[in-house]
């Protein structure tokens, strides 16, 4: 499973959205309906899944699916 597929799976589970709605340019808040608590839980899930750490400053830069995939790719 690719990084993007794993990110989409986590998003679909955490935000209870249809995976087909999750596009690379989808913004977590405006397109996928996430709130601030959802974002925190999502980032924690990504940290656990990929065994990485995301600082608060870095988290502020991760706004879309593509942002998350690119960030994780750089860390692995």
UniProtKB/Swiss-Prot annotation:
GO terms for molecular function: acyl binding; acyl carrier activity. One of its GO terms (cellular component) is cytoplasm. Keywords: Cytoplasm, Fatty acid biosynthesis, Fatty acid metabolism, Lipid biosynthesis, Lipid metabolism, Phosphopantetheine, Phosphoprotein. The lineage of its organism: Bacteria, Pseudomonadati, Thermodesulfobacteriota, Desulfobacteria, Desulfobacterales. Signal peptide: none annotated. Gene3D superfamilies: ACP-like. It is found in: Cytoplasm. This is Acyl carrier protein. Its main location: cytoplasm. 4'-phosphopantetheine is transferred from CoA to a specific serine of apo-ACP by AcpS. This modification is essential for activity because fatty acids are bound in thioester linkage to the sulfhydryl of the prosthetic group. Pfam families: PP-binding (PF00550). It comes from Desulfosudis oleivorans (strain DSM 6200 / JCM 39069 / Hxd3). The keyword Cytoplasm applies. It comes from the Bacteria. The modification O-(pantetheine 4'-phosphoryl)serine is found at residue 36. Belongs to the acyl carrier protein (ACP) family. Pathway: Lipid metabolism; fatty acid biosynthesis. Carrier of the growing fatty acid chain in fatty acid biosynthesis. Residues 1-76 form the Carrier domain. PROSITE patterns: CARRIER, PHOSPHOPANTETHEINE.
């Amino acid at each position: 499973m690719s990084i993007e597929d794993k990110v989409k799976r986590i998003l679909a589970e955490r935000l209870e959205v249809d995976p087909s709605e999750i596009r690379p340019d989808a913004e977590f808040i405006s397109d996928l309906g996430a709130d601030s608590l959802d974002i925190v839980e999502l980032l924690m899930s990504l940290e656990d899944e990929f065994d990485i750490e995301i600082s608060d400053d870095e988290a502020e830069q991760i706004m879309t699916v593509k942002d998350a995939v690119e960030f994780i790719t750089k860390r692995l």
